[in-house]
Amino acid sequence: MAIHFISDLHLADDTPALNQLFLDTLAAWRGRIAALYILGDLFEYWVGDDDDSPYLAAPLAAMRDFAAQTPLYVMRGNRDFLLGAGFEARSGARLLDDPTLIEAHGQRILLSHGDALCTDDAAYQQFRAMSRNPQWQQAMLAKPLAERHAIARHARAQSEMNKQQTGLTDISDVTENAVRELLAAHGWPTLIHGHTHRPAHHLHDASSRWVIQDWHGGRGGYLLLDDGGIRSLPLGN
C-alpha cells in the first residue's frame, strides 16, 4: 500500500473548511494506506498539550480513529513545536524527530518540516533555536493557558502582517547550501519537506527534493509514495 505525506494544514478555530477537509481525508484514507506522515504545522499554533479549545476535539478524535487502523506520524513544525507526549496520547500519533530517515518502496526518504533549511532568515533561525530550548519551553508551558493563547494570537497576527507586507521572499525559502549539507550528511537520500508553501520537485545532484503542498481555502494536496515512485496529488474541491 502507498504511504501519504501532508504538511502545513494550519488547522485553527477559524478554519472550518480546512478542519472538515482533514476529517474527510482521514476517513477516506483510514485502513487504505500503509502510513500517514504529517510533516509539521498540522495546527496554526499549539500552546500545550493541555489546550482544551473546543475545535480540537474533532480532529484529535479522528486521528485516534485513524491511528487505530493505520500508522500515523507527526513532526513538529514552526507553529506547533510544543506538541508533546500529551498530544500523542490524545491523538494516537507518534511524534517524529526532525529530520527522520525512513526506507520504503525501495527508497531512502529523509523527512523534515523544512524550516531549519531556511538559513538566510537569521531572525527566524534565532527564534527557532530559542523556542526549541527545553528551558524556554518549560517556562512557556508554565504560563496560564489563557496567557499562552494570547501570546500565540499576537504571534499569529504579527506573522500575517509580515506576510502582507513582504509576501514570499527569498529568505523564507530553503537555501541550496543547507539542503546539500543535510542530504550529504544522510548519504544523499530523497528529501521530503513542507514549510515553504512552494510545492515543487527539485533535483540536487542525484537526489530529489519534494516540497509538499500547503492547505488553504478548503483545498490542499499530498505526496503519494508507492512502488511507482513519488507523485504530488490534490485534495479538496
Swiss-Prot record:
It is found in: Cell inner membrane. One of its GO terms (cellular component) is extrinsic component of plasma membrane. Substrate binds at residues 78-79, 121, 159, 164, 195. Its cofactor is Mn(2+). CDD domains: MPP_YbbF-LpxH. It is an enzyme of class 3 (hydrolase). Mn(2+) 1 binds at residues 8, 10, 41, 197. It is a peripheral membrane protein. Belongs to the LpxH family. This is UDP-2,3-diacylglucosamine hydrolase. It comes from Chromobacterium violaceum (strain ATCC 12472 / DSM 30191 / JCM 1249 / CCUG 213 / NBRC 12614 / NCIMB 9131 / NCTC 9757 / MK). The lineage of its organism: Bacteria, Pseudomonadati, Pseudomonadota, Betaproteobacteria, Neisseriales.
